[in-house]
């Protein structure tokens, strides 16, 4: 420690100096203000003399052979002192006695050894309190407050108490009179308190210190150990001070604009209809000169692009960050966001650590997962954003994604809670399982079941792999007993559920782009009129220098304007999250495909906060439009104006809710009835986009053999191309399925200009179009473009190693019947599920009897005619076993329909208020089919053996099911 600091400590006492440091705000928003923050001067108090607790043994680090951790190159003391032993295993900390009652943040992350390393796992807000020889971390109850009289305050304190999140022994008194605690024991051997089952089986006997850094307002600790299975992983903890009253004024949230919120229940105002108070999460951004129309920011938000970001991407990352300055300029702030490049070659900003809470970083990883996420740290009392980072995984650009594997993420996003519960008890009808690779169906089924159970326990709707929050001990969280202790990252309901303060816990925007990039690599010859820009999965043909383009104007084998634009698109999205913005899945409805596929290349959506597929013009407009979002859109400008305007009167801003481009629908809207509030669609009419995708798929299928696979390539490339294109077909089907029983939902309030009804049934013409789309592109044989020659080419790679093991275990011949039946099953489930049929029934009630409406009987009749075409009107001709009357794909479909309809006929197998109607109508469908089967068998006695056996078997099953003495057993 420098001499001047030793003198200072001897004169004034370490405890008071630590208190001064703890009282300072947590974030420096510009390079010049990293060491001094508003409020630092106010925090200076006359220090007390150094005193040692006589009840504690004294600990001498030198005698114990411990070395102090010194992190700051500028010599500024850290939040508290730390020492590590010579073996790099044990880490001790001296917490100053003044830390008792000081508000702190603790954020914890699986930093390595996990496919999604770096994504924040959880956080806690609270303070340490001493209980004799123990320190307990106590989390205040922030989700229930009172602004009422003294009696209501006393009542709150009696019922809604604070909670202990974890505790640790006080081992001794430190050199400066503070409390010595064992961080290795707390964060390493006690990691299950924070990570639950994710660290079950970790071998803490081989634990080592991976990182220990002490900064003025935060301390960073990472511990490395073998996880379950033996692979090393590291757990990262960040403990930082929290600023208190710094002049920030909270802003109330409004459901018409999409912000993450900080919410509490006010029990002191019983007259309020809604006792919940919601603040938006936002930064404190102010004008340096309030008198200027356009003023520089008083304290701008500063992002540092980490030096690990590849040079070829840096300008696109920078442009994506700075794009948001246009939104702040409209509220009078110039340069609200600044960007600096950290560079190892020049040394620029290399003294800044990405883990230091004083700095906001754009981090770059290479786990090949392809994700991107922009979490932030928010004050749980006010909603003020204190700091934020964006984690970008290079797999977004470089990985050759198995798009088929992403289907379970896409399919069923609109399933209602009733439908999810029904599929849980009827997994044989769940398209998420049917479409999954057979090798992962078991684990996926278990995950989906756990997801549902967590949502039931928490009283929430599942939105991700593990929707419900959990406490640090791994127990299920509820909104009041675990306000801030919610699992983030993979499976957190995107940081929305079980939390008083919401945040962007997980985001699939980057992964969605990964799938489209994989298609672009395979179809580069069609999209960019080039041949062999990249060999795809032939790694030996890639340029050995990752920073070198394959050719001028190209990066990573694709045109720079294409790859760079998508990187900028994703960065704009994630930075939007760090500014407090939630997803807006209605952004894609700004314009028609023809309107944005022009030479002028206008914006393809109203916001960067949507999940947009790559725009490919397939005869939809006169020219190829922008591949993705090239700038922030009208919704982004409007929502920033609401959140960051200097004006107190926000009503004029909200009055523009019905302006073009201001429609808003977020994550919880995706499982509602509105087909426009969906991920992965595009255009004002998503059914036009679905048609376009089918044209895209059909156009490329015929080129798989000749152009997708080059001389010398493995034929496994053909299989991957086929499954990738089939996945695009399934996604188009999924877009159409959401229109059945759909209703447009608006968030406008009564009296808003151009007010529209909050719920309006989708035009029945559009619903019938969607139903016919499902029939034409899933239930008919010609929807798949299969030929004997193509099937003979859909092989797998033959590498007996980790990279090829999955292909080795797959059948060499593509499982055509299993895959096609999975798609057919998906289409049937999209129609015959409780949520869809319930919505169709509700729309009937919402529509006057004199007006047209799609009904359940019409839906079932249309489906019946499509499935049983060969029976309703038997085709003429000579049939044989090699040329059957009913193809094998159609026979499978008809069995599937029969199984489902028999099951739906029996009470108890279908949920919702429409169950009785579905049961009686299903019986009517089977009775009708019985007569049609009799007619077909009588009129075509010389049909092929396959068809006759099939129809006879179906007839017998239907007849038995209609027998009142039939015992149904699933």
Tell me what each language-model feature is.
Residues 1-8:
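N-terminal secretory signal peptides that target proteins for export/translocation
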Residues 309-313, 553-571:
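Short pre-active-site segment immediately N-terminal to the catalytic Zn-binding motif
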Residues 318-321, 325, 564, 568, ...:
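Extracytoplasmic/secreted envelope proteins and their assembly/folding machinery
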Residues 340-368, 565-572, 577-619:
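The catalytic-center signature of Zn2+-dependent metalloproteases
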